[in-house]
Amino acid sequence: WVETCSTSPARMFGMYPKKGIIAPGSDADILVWDPNGKTKIGINDKHHMNMDHSSWEGFKVDGKVDTVLSRGKIVVENDKFTGTKGHGKFIRRGLCQYLN
């Protein structure tokens, strides 16, 4: 699952090994998923950006984000965004590693 959702995309977009792996020197970006939870999608529920509509407004989906870590720092916990302005970081892409 990690290979499919994290490692392969990081290699495809030239971001591996900074992204896509948990190892010394790599970013510790981790999402803890609760497959038994439920999530209601809506602009006032789960979107942490400036938007006024969603095509999925009101839909309920299986699964729920429990915790999100960005570079080892908790940025989502207990359904609350706890990140800080300026925490984001530009990652320069390299070549797709599958083209070698």
Language-model segments: residues:
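Active-site microenvironment of metallo-dependent hydrolases
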Residues: 2-100
